[in-house]
Amino acid sequence: MDPQTAPSRALLLLLFLHLAFLGGRSHPLGSPGSASDLETSGLQEQRNHLQGKLSELQVEQTSLEPLQESPRPTGVWKSREVATEGIRGHRKMVLYTLRAPRSPKMVQGSGCFGRKMDRISSSSGLGCKVLRRH
């Protein structure tokens, strides 16, 4: 044995024997039986708690079901649908008018497809067929 590696090998051997004596566990107080008992008892408590909550929710749901099944007049639903359609149509028109100035429009008959703003605030039509008088 090399004198430099002998202490490290001895330390590893002692550590191995210590862990082998404990059954591979790092803590001497823990045992396989007690750890599994604690885990199963904790899981069992959680399971019982969740089952209790589930049964409470089911009781609440069954008590609320008769209230939800009450028939409503179809006229009320139709008037609501018409009102929402009117609101949606109005909203579409507002959005269309708001977006309209942003999009370039073609001027009919002139062939224009947009406008150009110069740095000095003068504007000109792009692609416009304009007859100029001399």
UniProtKB/Swiss-Prot annotation:
Single GO MF descriptor: hormone receptor binding
Gene Ontology terms: cellular component: cytoplasm; extracellular region; extracellular space; protein-containing complex
Pfam families listed in its UniProt record: ANP
Other remarks on this protein: Plasma levels of natriuretic peptides B, brain natriuretic peptide 32 and NT-proBNP are widely used for screening and diagnosis of heart failure (HF), as these markers are typically higher in patients with severe HF.
PTM section of the record: The precursor molecule is proteolytically cleaved by the endoproteases FURIN or CORIN at Arg-102 to produce brain natriuretic peptide 32 and NT-proBNP. This likely occurs after it has been secreted into the blood, either during circulation or in the target cells. CORIN also cleaves the precursor molecule at additional residues including Arg-99 and possibly Lys-105. In patients with heart failure, processing and degradation of natriuretic peptides B occurs but is delayed, possibly due to a decrease in enzyme level or activity of CORIN and DPP4. O-glycosylated on at least seven residues. In cardiomyocytes, glycosylation at Thr-97 is essential for the stability and processing of the extracellular natriuretic peptides B. Glycosylation, especially at Thr-97, may also be important for brain natriuretic peptide 32 stability and/or extracellular distribution. Glycosylation at Thr-97 appears to inhibit FURIN- or CORIN-mediated proteolytic processing, at least in HEK293 cells.
Entry keyword set: Disulfide bond, Glycoprotein, Hormone, Pharmaceutical, Proteoglycan, Secreted, Signal, Vasoactive, Vasodilator
Record's keyword annotation contains Signal: yes
Signal sequence residues: 1-26
Protein name (database record): Natriuretic peptides B
Residues carrying covalently attached carbohydrate according to the record: 41, 62-63, 70, 74, 79, 84, 97
